From Swiss-Prot:
Coiled-coil ranges from the UniProt annotation: none
Organism field: Coffea arabica (Arabian coffee)
The protein, known as: Small ribosomal subunit protein bS16c
InterPro entries reported for this sequence: Ribosomal_bS16, Ribosomal_bS16_CS, Ribosomal_bS16_dom_sf
BP-aspect Gene Ontology terms: mitochondrial translation
Pfam family, one: Ribosomal_S16
One GO MF term: structural constituent of ribosome
Any GO CC annotation of this UniProt entry: mitochondrion
Places the protein is found: Plastid, Chloroplast
Source domain of life: Eukaryota
Length: 88
């Protein structure tokens, strides 16, 4: 099963995160399938590859809670079909 989750990058006290599609059993810094976005909580910047995100969501990938909040703020779920909105 796939998840869309945050992968920590950056240095000490200056964390930035990549939003990646990754297997559920992999570690946080494990090998990802594809990078689909970027999130900087300090500068409050977000970059999302919406086409890749929609592809993985339609394939059954589940976003984590934090990633789901980021997607809601960006309006990614407005582009999904209504029957695709079931997340755990």
């Amino acid at each position: 099963m796939l998840k869309l989750r945050l992968k920590r990058c950056g240095r000490k006290q200056r964390a930035v995160f990549r939003i990646v599609a990754i297997d559920v059993r992999s570690r946080r810094e494990g090998k990802d399938l594809q990078k689909v976005g970027f999130y900087d909580p300090i500068k409050n910047q977000t970059y999302l590859n919406v086409t890749a995100i929609l592809y993985f969501l339609e394939q059954g990938a589940q976003p984590t809670g934090t990633v789901q909040d980021i997607f809601k703020k960006a309006g990614v779920f407005k582009e999904l079909r209504p029957n695709q909105m079931k997340f755990n």
